[in-house]
Design a protein with these regions (language model features):
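Charged, terminal alpha-helix-loop-beta segments
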Residues: 1-258
Length: 258
């Protein structure tokens, strides 16, 4: 972070900036993985009572989560999920890697976060281009995998596992992705998932939402007084970093981000 803020992060060649070239030798400052690591590396050490419920409620547009002590809170990055059962898909699919997984146990809850920085939400995945009649974007894949991982699909198992509350959030420089609104409708969500009739129930609606980077910095600024002095120092550094990353995008594409 300090390297970038002090202008030592280097720059991208044009093919790399457009996403046409990937360099395996270095993680570029423009990588969304770098932003993910900085953002959630900081949030991990802040008191979750003062940021987690407000962040989720902002994403969902409703007061669904309350301030509380979070038992067994875990924030994990780039977590691989179980391979989705082949018999429930019309295409081959490998393991899904979720950018951020937040979980706690009172009540049992799992949050998937899909992070984006310099690229758009992918319209297709590696083995699914949508030709089988189902949407193939990253958001619906994460929704499908998350619902199964948290017990919302009916499966012919010897033992039934208890359901966990589930939330899926798209975190990008700007809000307004139409897929978020589309998949918030239960009927549309079911028709977008193979064997959607197995979804006999769904988490409390809405459970799919979105955040912008500015939502995050605004929330941390508003809640800053509730944190300890060391936490405030971390918040100030993170807010400066995210503002810097938004400025980089603005310079690259000629418009701002809200």
């Amino acid at each position: 972070m300090l390297t970038e803020l002090n202008g030592k992060g280097g720059c991208l060649c044009e093919p790399a900036r457009k996403g046409e070239l990937r360099c395996p030798l270095i993680v570029r400052p423009s990588s969304e993985d770098v932003v993910t690591g900085q953002l959630f590396g900081t949030l991990k050490v802040l008191n979750p009572r003062w940021w987690l419920p407000d962040l989720l409620n902002t994403a969902l547009g409703t007061e669904r989560f309350r301030k509380q002590f979070y038992r067994d809170l875990r924030i994990e990055l780039w977590q691989k999920q179980r391979t989705y059962p082949r018999q429930h898909l019309q295409w081959d699919e490998g393991q899904t890697e979720v950018d951020v997984v937040i979980s706690w146990e009172n009540p049992a809850t799992t949050v998937f976060i899909e992070m984006k920085y310099g690229s758009n939400l992918s319209a297709t995945t590696t083995h699914n281009n949508g030709s089988d009649g189902f949407p193939s974007d990253q958001l619906i894949r994460n929704a499908r995998v998350g619902l199964r991982e948290n017990g919302w699909f009916y499966e012919d198992l010897l033992f039934e596992f208890p359901k966990r509350d589930f939330v899926l959030i798209l975190l990008t420089p700007t809000r307004g992705n139409p897929l978020v609104t589309e998949y918030q409708h239960p009927d549309r969500l079911r028709t977008a998932i193979p064997h959607g009739e197995r979804l006999t129930d769904l988490p409390r609606s809405p459970f799919i939402g979105e955040l912008s980077y500015r939502n995050v910095t605004d929330l941390l600024s508003q809640q800053r007084r509730l944190f300890s002095p060391p936490e405030r120092t971390l918040i100030d550094g993170l807010n400066e970093y995210l503002a810097f990353k938004l400025t980089q995008l603005k310079a690259a594409n000629g418009h701002g981000h809200d």
